[in-house]
């Protein structure tokens, strides 16, 4: 029941409420500017309002964008609730190709950049392989999970694919033949994300059971389990050198809602935590080395904020509030100064990281 004008009224049906919420979010995005925290050269952090409106391109998805990944220096691949994957040139604002084949929402994307190919996972329990230069129909279908597929990771040599699901299992596939070659299952291990360690046979995996696991792809055996966290681990990312990984946590009201840096070498200890979001942190990435003197990471969360952190100290260097976008679902690195951020209500945001005077994070386009 709802209290309106001092009287109890019947609550809105769920579908109507969801549509109303989406409309309110989109309206809010047109009425409010994005705000961000600017880190000045003298170390002072101040809040600013972005006065220059971002370029608004025609949205490539008609519903929530669940995942974004970069295929090469110009193209990104996005997937969402509209069941399609889209190849998009984020530098020119032009859609390159739409891929249709899944029966339900796309949950994950994993790219093979050198081959211009990618995999998509879905709530329809399948994984499809696509070729940018080929047909708009899938090149290959991998079926083996009993529930929604929630993890995808391609091996460094692109010969193997690891998939994970809410069915508690991980499957290892031969990309060339499309055959499942290994299977592993752990009770209550509801997979949320997978990431292959560069130049290594290891796979990092996050789970709803609040743990981060390290798997050896040689036989698909669990090699290590990091200390259990207090909240669901939603995502993970491995550094380019393979020495560290980040995981991020669910939460609400600032409880949980953090990202954590882990050592993947001998000690495998927790190295740093990044706290400042107020809702579930859905994605985390290492930023490429830049003119900045410090290594940095970025996070996006359901509180509509993207944050940049000093990787070594845990200090928040910049915060961008994407008002009206709703929960932010996925982050991807475009290039040394660009981030791509997927959202519930406003598609994909192109963000610019500017180091010319201090540190600024601003939205420059949406599609």
From Swiss-Prot:
Keywords: Repeat, WD repeat. The keyword Repeat applies. PROSITE patterns: WD_REPEATS_1, WD_REPEATS_2, WD_REPEATS_REGION. Coiled coil: none annotated. WD repeats lie at residues 60-100, 101-140, 144-183, 186-225, 276-319. The keyword Cytoplasm does not apply. It comes from Mus musculus. This is WD repeat-containing protein 31. InterPro entries: G-protein_beta_WD-40_rep (IPR020472), WD40/YVTN_repeat-like_dom_sf (IPR015943), WD40_repeat_CS (IPR019775), WD40_repeat_dom_sf (IPR036322), WD40_rpt (IPR001680), WDR31 (IPR040066).
């Amino acid at each position: 029941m709802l209290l309106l004008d001092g009287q109890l009224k019947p609550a809105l049906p769920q579908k109507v409420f969801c549509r109303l919420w989406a409309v309110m979010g989109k309206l809010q995005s047109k009425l409010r500017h994005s705000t961000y925290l600017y880190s000045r050269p003298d170390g002072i952090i101040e809040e600013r309002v972005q006065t220059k409106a971002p370029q608004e391109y025609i949205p490539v998805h008609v519903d929530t964008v669940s995942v974004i990944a970069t295929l090469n220096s110009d193209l990104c691949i996005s997937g969402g609730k509209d069941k399609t994957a889209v190849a998009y040139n984020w530098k020119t604002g032009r859609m390159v190709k739409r891929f249709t084949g899944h029966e339900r929402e796309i949950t994950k994307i994993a790219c093979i950049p050198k081959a211009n190919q990618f995999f998509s996972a879905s709530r329809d329990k399948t994984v499809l392989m696509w070729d940018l230069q080929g047909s708009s129909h899938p090149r290959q279908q991998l079926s083996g999970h009993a529930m929604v597929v929630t993890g995808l990771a391609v091996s460094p040599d692109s010969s193997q694919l690891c998939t994970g699901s809410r069915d508690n299992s991980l499957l290892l596939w031969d990309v060339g033949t499309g055959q499942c070659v290994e299977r592993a299952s752990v009770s209550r291990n509801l997979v949320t994300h997978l990431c292959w360690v560069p130049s290594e046979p290891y796979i990092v995996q996050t789970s709803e059971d609040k743990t981060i696991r390290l798997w050896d792809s040689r036989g698909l055996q669990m090699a290590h389990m990091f200390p259990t966290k207090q909240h669901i681990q939603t995502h993970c990312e491995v550094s380019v050198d393979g020495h560290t990984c980040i995981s991020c946590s669910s939460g609400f009201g600032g409880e949980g809602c953090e990202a954590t840096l882990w050592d993947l070498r001998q000690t495998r200890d927790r190295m740093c935590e990044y706290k400042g979001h107020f809702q579930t942190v859905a994605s985390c990435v290492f930023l490429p080395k830049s003119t900045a003197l410090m290594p940095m990471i970025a996070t996006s969360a359901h509180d509509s904020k993207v944050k940049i952190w000093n990787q070594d100290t845990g200090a928040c260097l910049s915060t961008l509030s994407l008002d009206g976008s709703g929960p932010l679902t996925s982050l991807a690195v475009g290039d040394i100064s660009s981030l791509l951020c997927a959202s519930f209500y406003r598609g994909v945001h192109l963000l610019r990281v500017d180091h010319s005077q201090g540190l600024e994070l601003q939205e420059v386009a949406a599609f």
